Amino acid sequence: MGRRPARCYRQIKGKPYPKSRYCRGVPDPKIRIYDVGMKRKGVDEFPFCVHLVSWEKENVSSEALEAARIACNKYMVKSAGKDAFHLRIRVHPFHVLRINKMLSCAGADRLQTGMRGAFGKALGTCARVAIGQVLLSVRCKDAHGHHAQEALRRAKFKFPGRQKIIVSRKWGFTKFNRADFTKLRQEKRVVPDGVNAKFLSCHGPLANRQPGSAFLPAHY
């Protein structure tokens, strides 16, 4: 018996059903890598960021996530280079899908009980996605921004429903706007922390603050 199409499980029905000690025998998700490209590049290297945002409430299978990751990564490597971007998958397939197998051969009515005890067994996994939730994010240099948008456009065909490609106003994967980040960086109020940035607030002991930054305005 082949794999049941994901269109049968597209609608979100009922509660989340994650893998647990009560839900055993779940197949591993097809997607195993969630960060692709130069994931160790600092926050200053890639200022441009673009998101692929879901515009429907639905289930997205792990096979679709893996197919989108491969399509996006392949185009970015070919067009921008393997050292010029960082791709991140923003959803994880924790929801377990079930199937109540039915026999279709001759004499099947003697072997099975129909809809009696029809809870089903684990078939695969999917991610429960809400409206406005980010599916994929790519950060890169400004010169490769159009390549990143085209890569996400190609990845969009791997998903059901509707998605939108939104260019972020933030600096990379941080929570700061680009203008604010540049200003705070000049004032030395943000410290690079991997792909993110740590904000130095005006709270805490005076002895731990740098000279000249003891009494900063608290509107940030």
Swiss-Prot record:
Transmembrane segments: none annotated. Signal peptide: none annotated. Its main location: cytoplasm. It comes from the Eukaryota. Disulfide bonds: none annotated. Keywords: Cytoplasm, Nucleus, Phosphoprotein, Plant defense, Ribonucleoprotein, Ribosomal protein. GO terms for molecular function: mRNA binding; structural constituent of ribosome. Induction: Not regulated by UV-B. GO terms for biological process: cellular response to UV-B; defense response to virus; developmental process; translation. Ubiquitous, with the highest expression in flowers. Expressed in seedlings, leaves, roots, stems and flowers. Expressed in young leaves, mostly in dividing cells and in the hydathodes, in the root tips and lateral root primordia, in pistils, anthers, and pollen grains, and in developing seeds. It is found in: Cytoplasm; Nucleus. Disruption phenotype: No visible phenotype, when heterozygous. Lethality in the female gametophyte, when homozygous. Enhanced susceptibility to geminivirus infection. One of its GO terms (cellular component) is nucleus. Phosphorylated by NIK1 and NIK2 in vitro. The keyword Acyltransferase does not apply. The keyword Phosphoprotein applies. Ribosomal protein involved in translational regulation. Contribute to general translation under UV-B stress. Involved in the NIK1-mediated defense response to geminivirus infection. Acts coordinately with LIMYB as a transcriptional repressor. Component of the small ribosomal subunit. Mature ribosomes consist of a small (40S) and a large (60S) subunit. The 40S subunit contains about 33 different proteins and 1 molecule of RNA (18S). The 60S subunit contains about 49 different proteins and 3 molecules of RNA (25S, 5.8S and 5S). Interacts with NIK1. Interacts with LIMYB. This is Large ribosomal subunit protein uL16z. The gene is RPL10A.
